[in-house]
Amino acid sequence: ELDLAFELAFAEDDEILIESFLDGMEVSVGVVDFEGETIVLGITEIVPTKEFFDYEAKYEGASEEITPARIDEATKVKVEEIAKRAYNSLGMSGFSRSEYIIMNGTPYMLEMNTNPGFSPASILPQQAKIYGISIKDLCGNEVEKALAKNKK
């Protein structure tokens, strides 16, 4: 199977990327700079009804999103620390939503989305609501930061 996969991949390009399959719980973590503090809004567990969390799963309800995620406190703390560290290390200042797979209590970062969805079905607004921050306040915070930056 691997030889055929290589053949198909190299038929498309002369470079390919091979990654290990991470079999674990998928979580999404919202992080924002709110009133001068880096805040983890929440950790949402993604329970797909399909094999992958694709467009249908994300926007057409083919997955269950559980906030807060069903993880132990030690894992929660690890995920929050990594999410904050990644956000700050990348010099982020607005909204972000990062994705992780948790295997045996170890979080593996998959990606960071710097332009997360803001529809009522989107994860970040749901996390903000649970955290106690309204969308109005979240967006107002961004406007205030932009105005302050332009005054400099």
PLM features: what roles do these ranges have?
Residues 72-152:
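ATP-dependent carboxylate activation and anion-phosphoryl transfer catalytic cores
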